[in-house]
Amino acid sequence: GMYTHEGSDP
C-alpha cells in the first residue's frame, strides 16, 4: 500500500 506494514499490504 502507502507504507510497508508487517504481514499486511505493502
Curated annotation (Swiss-Prot):
Single GO biological process annotation from the record: proteolysis
E.C. no: 3.4.11.2
Cofactor note: Binds 1 zinc ion per subunit.
Keywords carried by this UniProt record: Aminopeptidase, Hydrolase, Metalloprotease, Protease, Zinc
Reactions performed catalytically: Release of an N-terminal amino acid, Xaa-|-Yaa- from a peptide, amide or arylamide. Xaa is preferably Ala, but may be most amino acids including Pro (slow action). When a terminal hydrophobic residue is followed by a prolyl residue, the two may be released as an intact Xaa-Pro dipeptide
Main function: Acts as a receptor for B.thuringiensis Cry1Ac delta-endotoxin.
Cofactors named for this entry: Zn(2+)
Top-level EC class: hydrolase
Similarity comment: family membership: Belongs to the peptidase M1 family.
Regulation: Inhibited by the zinc-chelators 2,2-dipyridyl and 1,10-phenanthroline.
Record carries keyword Protease: yes
Keyword Ribonucleoprotein attributed: no
Name of the featured protein: Aminopeptidase N
Superkingdom of origin: Eukaryota
GO MF, one example: metallopeptidase activity
